[in-house]
Amino acid sequence: MEDMAANGCLTVLLGVDDAGRVEAWVAERPGCVVFAAGEDEALRRIPAAAAEYDGWLARWGLARLWDIPAVARALRTADQTGVCILERVPVGESIVHGNTAAFFAWDQQPVTDDEIEATLRLLAASRRELLATLRRFQPDQLTLRPGGGARTVEQIAR
């Protein structure tokens, strides 16, 4: 088996709903996801999303966070360049940004201690960044309801 990343290929897992909306997960970058109106759009946006994710990890000193055996499950022979689809599954509910619904064969594998440790490190860095961002907000900004939602920024953060 060849490492698709070594071939310049990002492996993705696609969940597709009845309307054709897609959630596209980058297999070697747990938590890196693109939500799009269709598959072509999702696949076009994957390289930029992966680069942004990698930059974020590097800023927090976590560039090699996912260099663990469990994440190497994304390996297979590359038959595409750029973005390679590892798995495509139908999703029985509407896909909207932030609402993940796909369940992949990948998800059936038991979580390893290394994955749990890496995830906890990622969450700690995310929290630090969120708190640093919130400290720059003015008090009235904390009462905003993003996207016209039911909760304020402060309620979401708590």
Question: Model regions: which residues?
Answer:
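Aromatic-glycine hotspot motif
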Residues: 2-158
